[in-house]
Amino acid sequence: MRHLFLALALASVSYFAHSQESFQLTEKSILGLTLTSAPQWDQIEAAFNEAKAQSLEVGDQFRPELFGEAAHNETKEKAIIQFAPVWSPQQNTQLGVRQAFRGGLSASAAFGTDQRSASTPNGRFERISTSSIRVDLQVDLWRDLFGRLSKAQSQSAEFDLKRAEIEREIQQKTFTLGLRRTYWSMVANNEQIKVYEGLKKIALEQLADARKRRAAGVTDDGEVARYEAQVASREGSRLYYLYQRELLMKQLKVLLPELQSKEVALAPYDIPKMIQTVLACTATIASQSSVPMEFTKFDEVTALLRQTQRERTKLASAYDDVDLKFVGGVRTTGVASEGDGNGNYTGSYDDAFRDWQQNDRTGFSAGLRFTMPLGREKTRETKELYESKRFDAKVKERESEIATTHQQLVKVIALLADVVRSQKENSLALERRLAVQNRKFREARVSVNDLILDQDAYLNSNLVTIQTQLEIINTIFDYLVVFTETPCEFNRI
């Protein structure tokens, strides 16, 4: 029964493993996935939409809005004197529209009604009704004269949105480059595993040969043990790189959840072709004697930062400005209050409307509203300094990144290319030496320790070559993060 259960469990695991859809991993197949399902992609979109929402909020200040209110008040309080009646019930309504404009102007228009009743010792007021139309105007005469501040606020939001659009493109490019980094790390890891598998195979062959020679009495247990240790060492290193591969696979599946249900495996790749593509791209980069501004969008970001800084400084400078406004309004009213000669008055909404149409009760108001802040100079100066410093820091950071990335990475790539050439020459020399050492070992002219030392030197040289090639690729990726429009094949994948 126990064996049956184990067999069923193994069959279930095997079925699950085979039921997973396979996915052949290449640069193009990664980028062909639905990148929009990636969490990091969502974060990029969220950051952009946050900037977009902030820009729209600024624009919403200058959109019309409808407002209104309705109220009913009632009390059982009695009038003490006839000249001061207690109005109950009272009903008030108002409906209107208002809008602020970018020129420092705001206006509103509203229609309202009022109906109330009251009683006094000398009579009764029943449904006394009033209807009114009011138009109000407010003009900024100083602080926002001709829309100086409202325009600065709108333009600042517009520049922020344009910058967010460009930064979204840059971040999306950075994300895809990050996926490609992971892919090439997996390729390098696979090459490292191949190196250790090859050396492990050689070590196993040498171990088998040593055991034969021990059986023939040619060698002793010490040499066999040395080869056994070498096999274990090679296997341990191979398992370590297999562990690294699983970590890279986990990293890739975290970046692309679409791969979580798939059995992912590296598709065949062409390293010589990749090297030629990389070298062609490095040649394009190295051919630029000066910083190729046409290859980057960072300069557009810095220009927009400067424009935003200018508008934000205007807003900060107005913090303690005098606030002087003209306020005016026009109102026309209709009243319904018909007396019967006995101290009783009645009215209705209809009568109020008719009175409004038949009698001109138009009135107007005009005035100035003045506010002068006192003691806010230090706050204004601090705000101005804050806007100046924070934008200066962002601009300098971008400008430095543009210049340094081109100047230094060109040198770094050249140095790494020299390292690869040197390592290849070193590997070829070590390969020739290893062949000689193997022959000498078979002739009993060198010790097993000397042979293993030469094998380790050859191994390390190959590993360094692989790692350096990966460094070149990552360095180019660093360059393409800034110079996203570099015209080379490696950047068009």
Model-assigned labels for residue ranges:
Residues 3, 61-65, 102-104, 132, ...:
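Strand-connecting loop/turn motifs
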Residues 6, 18, 76, 240, ...:
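Acidic, low-complexity, intrinsically disordered peripheral segments
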Residues 12-14:
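N-terminal signal peptide c-region/cleavage motif recognized by signal peptidases
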Residues 19-92, 142-152, 156-158, 165-166, ...:
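Bacterial Sec-pathway N-terminal export signals of envelope proteins
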Residues 25, 159, 165-293, 412, ...:
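Periplasmic alpha-helical coiled-coil/stalk elements that build and connect Gram-negative outer-membrane
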Residues 41-58, 171-198, 205-207, 230-231, ...:
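Amphipathic alpha-helical coiled-coil segments
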Residues 42-46, 59, 102-127, 142-167, ...:
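Sec/SRP-type N-terminal targeting helices
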Residues 70-139, 272-280, 314, 327-374, ...:
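Small/polar, glycine/serine/threonine/aspartate-rich low-complexity segments that form flexible
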